[in-house]
Amino acid sequence: REGHQKVLWPSKVKWFAKSSGTTDARSKFIPVTKEALEECHYKGGKDLLARYYSQKPDAKVYSGKHLVLGGSSKINPFNEEGYTGDLSAIIIRNLPVWAEIMRTPSRDIALMDNWEEKIEMIARTTMDEDIYMMAGVPSWTMVLLKRILELKGAESIKEVWPNLELFWHGGVSFKPYRDQFSKLIPSLAMNYVETYNAS
């Protein structure tokens, strides 16, 4: 984190994912290399898409936008050439073209620090887009969907985004949120995929 290179890995490390501190309540900063992004996170994303399409051959996820709700990142206070942040923010900052081209909102909005402002900006900039897929943690995604319903004066997210078919979620168990999402998105055609993207 302080800028020393090639200590444990042969290539340069400039990203450090802040862990949630689940093992002892303290956050840790885990190095994230270009190779880890490519061989773990993006490869995992491709695997998830391939599995989804193998189970749903008529899926149309790539016919419209993907709303990705992630965390934030900032300059590393120990080394100005590096960054620290949520793993989701590191992934968003470095997405390959095949994923970035479909993603919404803009990177500037997606990586905002203030969650209340971020939710408001995402709601206003995406509510009129053609969203086919969402990805994020259930809690903040639910807050976002409720705000969009308020802004649009709609009863259900399917009124706003009729082509929405998939929600990739992780970070926490989906079980406590399932009923609430079923009310927000009352559609038997809606698919939910739980994934845990470890730092």
Located regions from the model:
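Active-site phosphate/ATP/adenylate-binding loop shared across adenylate-forming ligases
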Residues: R1-S199
